[in-house]
C-alpha cells in the first residue's frame, strides 16, 4: 500500500508540473506471470466528479480501490497507478455547488509542498513510504550505445 501511495504522490507532482488535472485514477496489482501456482491480477478505477491534481484526492481514491482488489496470501510482484481523463488546469468547468474557495486553498497547499520538495524531499504525506523506499538499482543495466557517447565501446 505504501509503495502505491508513493507512486500516487509522484504522479500528482508530475501532473501539477505539467499544469494538468485528472478525473480518473486506476490502480493495478499482479503476481508474477512466471509463477504458475498463484496467478492473480486486478485493476480498478475511480472517477472524480471534478478533475483534480491534489495528492490527497488521489490517495483517498487509492484507499477506496485497494481493499477491493487486494487478496491476501498472494505474493505480489508489481503494483502501479494510471491517471487518465486529463484536462488543462485553466479549463476546468466549475459547478454551482463546487466550493471554489477550498479548491484555491488546496491548490496553494500543493504548490507550497511542491516548492519545498523541489530539490530534496522535505514534506511527506503520512501514508507515504518514508525512508523505506529503495530506488531502482541500476547496476545490471545494459549500456546505452545509441543514446550516450560514454557508453560506446572504444577500439584500440
Q: Predicted regions span which residues?
A:
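Basic, low-complexity intrinsically disordered segments
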Residues: 1-156
